[in-house]
């Protein structure tokens, strides 16, 4: 069981998953960043709740100074903006509803200058009970081959201890990770057939639909050929001393996407949520420089490149179908294909999941989230 402590200036209480007098409200919250970099926090409560929401801010997701809220809003307003000119230090927020119920939330995306698709996978609800993935524990991204000075500072501020590099050996040799502040664990999963498709693109021999077929074959191969490597990567998450962990590949969408999907599956996160996380790569990959490189290619080649650089739910769905066809269920794939035992799944849940809603009923100086 993982204990995360949030120190309170005022007296606090014992934590409960529910309310001693009636049902605890269901509180959903989301944090976004606008074009300037300000944080926009939105929430909904069910049932409808009146009263005051107090907002607290911290550089870490599990320790908040409660001496002074950074913002207030009527609960019915459903949103508040935290204005900042700090685009280096990542912020997390604690929402207090009537000084009784508390939710933590962070922005999904981490702003970077030279790293594609860096995201926090905290805040995803498990199917069972009042638990969600913890913020600031696991990140996913593209390769770290080029880092600005600010990017290095941002990664340092995330306190990344371990980077799981899923790129093939040839990719690593051409573009080694530049971040030196973490332990790099290389678990190579090669991109098969990339030389052939690159040659056909250059020679103008690519046909409409070739990119789609190539990506479908890639995702099937994750199940048929690369389960050993993905299973090895999952074992890294079993050691709590490895956290926070960053999983990456070239763009952070395919190999990192499949591994993240399997990890979330092991945590009993609903498949619909897993698919949304996977598809979010389309919103966090900057294709402008790649589009410039493809400007002189024919229409079919440009379309193929667009396909190769995106995420398509049919690809991950195809992998899930292959898993269920070959193994009968995702649970059996986790145990037989990825060699993850039920006890190890419980360990992952103890490390990564925590209470999504904190209920405070009696005064105390410390809140313990378990």
What are these regions (language model features)?
Residues 12, 169-170, 366:
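Alpha-helix capping/helix-boundary segments
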Residues 9-17:
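Bacterial N-terminal signal peptides
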Residues 20-246, 259-357:
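Cys-dependent protein tyrosine phosphatase-like superfamily
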Residues 252:
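Substrate/cofactor-recognition hotspot
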Residues 249:
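Short cysteine clusters
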